[in-house]
Amino acid sequence: ASSLSKGNTLPLALEPAHRHRLSEWPEAGTASICPQKLAAVYLLSSRIGLWRRVLPHISHGMIDFSSVSLRGIDPRDYPVYRAAKGLYCGKLLITSAELADEEQVSSEAFGDILNAMLIARYGKTIIAAEVKK
């Protein structure tokens, strides 16, 4: 049995700017959000540069990763993008060696990736003060 069963949540507090970006997603307040999709959107919206590139490619609840241009992004955002895409697609796209390399993944990004993994597993109940439209 999970230690985060119903009623026992580990709320994640979001920075106001991150919460605002997440609320821009049309499905943010939807009760039936797939946890993996929410985890990917949570992670992508954690970085303003990524979010600006990805948001136009979200339609009808789907993220069209093949249409997202990554040219010119901050190199430290690329592992965050790959982790989000992996969570969304159900594939491991970032290695433990990459996660452990502080030159590739900052401590903040590492924390965001771990939070996204928790969201993918336990759903939106772990996000404190649920995002509302």
Each predicted region: which residue ranges?
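Extended, charge-biased low-complexity segments
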Residues: 1-85, 89-133
